[in-house]
């Protein structure tokens, strides 16, 4: 596993080192559904060459109550103004995990 994948896994599991955003479609769900979806995202570990061709663990989908949910990690500078110059360097990178319905992509 590469450095970016390790950093992405740690962030996804702990939410440390960045921000988590829920889109309007996810935010409109019940508290129970949101908690279940967040738990599924944090515990996802089924990365394969088919769904993670670059090996960075930065995007995946899950199914929840007949909804396809996407989870996507993007890389920003420490002020969240620009794209990070080096996502493998946590000293200059903040991560943003967006959890969204597939229809919101």
Q: Model segments located where?
A:
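Short, compact, well-ordered microdomains
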Residues: 59-105
């Amino acid at each position: 596993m590469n450095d970016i994948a390790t950093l992405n896994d740690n962030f996804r599991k702990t939410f440390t080192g960045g921000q988590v955003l829920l889109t309007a479609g996810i935010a409109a769900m019940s508290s129970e559904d949101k908690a279940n979806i967040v738990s599924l995202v944090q515990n996802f570990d089924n990365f394969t060459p088919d769904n993670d061709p670059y090996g960075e663990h930065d995007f995946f989908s899950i199914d929840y109550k007949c909804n396809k949910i996407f989870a996507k990690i993007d890389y920003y500078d420490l002020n969240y103004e620009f794209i990070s110059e080096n996502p493998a360097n946590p000293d200059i990178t903040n991560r943003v995990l967006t959890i969204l319905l597939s229809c919101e992509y």
